[in-house]
C-alpha cells in the first residue's frame, strides 16, 4: 500500500525542529564548523598552490602550459588548430646580450605576439607592444641599466649577439624607439626586450645571407587543462604525425612542459607513499567532520527518543523516522553550510598572506584562489559527512520500540547489575557513567586524542627537518664566490681571477679555503661502450644511438667519452665524500691518481654502481689542444651540407695520460661545474691537472669556511658590498642564505600544520562539550531523582567533573598509544617524501597537553552544570517527562 504522506512527514520534521531551537543552534554550529574546516582547508591549500605556481611561473618566465620548440610556420598553424590547444602564442628569439650591464641578468631580444607577451608577464603597462620598424618595449630595470629614462618615444641603443638555432654569431648595435614599458620583476630569469615582427624578419634575412641558420620560432600553448601537460602535448604531436624525441628529424616537434605547474611536478613524482599520504589526509578530514556532527545528532535522537517512540505507536514506519531525521539534517545544512562557506573562505583568505609572509614566496605573488573546487568540494564533503553522521542515529530511532523509548536514559546496559555494600563513591559513579554508552565515550576520547596525536605528529614532523642535511645539499661551504657565468651554468673563457681571490682572502678570515679549477682544453676519458650507451640512451633512439657509436673513436671495447675534469686545491679534498677507496694518493706529489665523481640520489644511495669503473682500475684520459668535426666520408672538415650522421670528431695535439682510480667520491654540486652531461665526472689535484693538461687550468670558484659566527657575519657583510650592483663582476652564495630559506620553509609548515591542529583541536573540544551536554540533557530525569533522594548539587557537579577528568586523561592515554603506533610509520613515509627529514621520536607534546586537558576537564563540566541546574528539582522532573 502506497500512502502519500510525504507532506505530513515534512511538517513533522519542521515542527519538531522548531521545538528544539537551542539544540538546533548547536547543530547548525557543528555543521558550519565542519564546512568551515573543509572550506578553509581547500582555500588555504589551493591558494598556497596558486601562489606557489605564480612564484614558479615568474622564475620560469611565463605561465603557458608548454612549448612546441623550433616549429615551422606550417607546423605552428596545424598545432594551433588542434582541438586540445585552446590558444597559442609565437616567439622568435633573434639575439641575446649577457655582458656589461646585463652580466648578472641577461636580456633576450625577441618578437612575441599578443598571447606570448601576456603569458610572459611582458605586457606594457605604459604604451603598447612594438608593431613595426625599430620599435621596442622592455622593463624599467633594463632601461635603467641602459641609462634611459622610461619615457615613450625615447631612443634606446642596444648591442646584442645574433643567435640562430645552432650558434651565437656576430654583434649588432641598433637604436630603437621606446613604445612601451613595464615594471621589472626581480624573479624573472631574463630581461625581455621585445621588438616588432618586421625588425625580426629583417635581421633574420641578413643573418641567413651570412650563412647562419633561420632563427628558431617556439610556439607556447595553453591547453584544455593544466593536468597531464606532457601527455596532452605528446598526443597533439601524435595526432599530427610528429615525433618529439629527436633533434635532427625534420618531422620531430620537441616539447617542453612548464614545470611551474604543480600538477606536472606531481605527475612526475607520484609514488605510493604520496598517494597514501593524500588519501590518509582526506580520510582524516572527513572523519574529523564526522566526529563533530555525529554526536550532535546522537544528542538530538537521545533527547527526542520518547517522541520517536510515540510516533511509532501511531503507525510511523522506521523508513519514515529515518526520513524525518535526514530532512532535519538537510534543513540545518541550508543554514550551516552557507555560513561555513563564508567563514571558511574568509579565514583561508586571511591566513594565506600570513603564511606566505613567513616564506621566501612573499614577493607580491599572494593569490587567493577562487576555484569552484573550494566551494563545490566543501559542500559535497559537508553533505556527505552530515548524511553519514545522521545515518546511525536514524537507524537507532527507527529500531527503538515505544516501551524502550520511555525507559531510555542514554545507557547501553548489557552486564548484570551487582549489589555493593560499600556505598556509592563519586569517582566510581563517574567511571561507571562513562561505560553506559561506550560508543559515545570512545568517539569523544578518539576525537580529543586525534587532535593531540596530530599536534605530536606536527612537532615530530617539523622537528625532523634536518637543517644540516638541507644546508649541506644547498652549499658545501660558508661562502662560494665566482662570476655570474658560473652560477648560471654558462661555459666561459674566464671565471674568477687569481687577483680577485687574493683580494677576498685578504679581507676575510677563513678557517678553510681553496680554489676549484676548470680545464679549458678538450678532455676525454675512455670508458666502456656499454657505459656510454647508458648516457646517450636518455637522449637518442636506438637507431640514432647505433649511428652515434659508430662515429666515435674506439680502442677495443673502450670508447672515447666526453668528461668534466675538475681540479681542486689540496685543502678542498676534505669536502669530498668518499664512497669507496682512498683519496690520499691524490695528495702525493707527482701522483697519477684520479677520483671518479658519482651521482647519488636524494637519500645518499648510488643507483647504478655498475656504470662506474672500480677502484684500482686504470683509466685513460686524452687531452687535446683543439677539436674539429670532419666528414667521415671524405676526411675533410664538415660543411653546412654535411648530414649529422657523418660528423666525426678529430683531435689536434692529442696526448694520453693513464690514471689509477683511487676512489669513488661524491663531489658537492655547489663546488662542481653545476651541470652534467654524458661521460664521467672526475676530480684531480690542481698540480696534477696543471701538469697533464699543459697548463690549461683556470680558477672557476673560490670557497671558504669561517671559524665562528662573528667571522661569518663580517665575511657576509664584505661580500655583500663587493658584489653589490649590476656592474660587479662577482656573485656569491652563502650558508646564511640557505639557513634563511630553510627557516622560512619550516615556518610555513608550522603555520599550516598549527592551523590544522587548532581546527581539529576545536573539533575535539566541541565533542567534549557535546559529550558533557549529552550526559546532562539525556540524564536530567536521573539527576532530578538523585537530588530528590538526597544528592546535593555539589556532589552532582563533582561527579561530572570526575567524568570530565576521566575523558581528559583517557584522551591523553589514547594519544600516547596512537603516537607510539603511528609515529614510526608516519616518520618512515615522511622520510621517503622529504629527503632532508630525519624522524626523531618525541612524546613531549603529549605530556604538555596534560595540564590543558585537566583544566578543561574541570572547567567545562562546572560551567555546563551550573547553567543546567538553575531549575528546581520539581521543574527538572516535570521537564524530564
Regions found by a protein language model. Give the residues of each.
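Feature of multi-pass inner-membrane transport and sensor proteins
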Residues: 1-26, 303-320, 347-376, 384-448, ...
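Hydrophobic alpha-helical transmembrane signal-anchor segments
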Residues: 18, 23-46, 280, 287
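Interfacial "coupling" helices/loops that link adjacent transmembrane helices in transporter permeases
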Residues: 20, 291-332, 764-807
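Hydrophobic transmembrane alpha-helices
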Residues: 34-35, 283-290, 384-385, 758-768, ...
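Basic-flanked hydrophobic alpha-helices used for secretion and membrane insertion
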Residues: 46-265, 463, 470-753
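Short helix-loop junctions at transmembrane helix boundaries
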Residues: 48, 270, 341-377, 391, ...
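N-terminal membrane-entry
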Residues: 268-285, 373, 743-760
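Selective transmembrane-helix segments that form parts of the transport pathway or gating/packing helices
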Residues: 325-342, 379, 414-419, 800-814
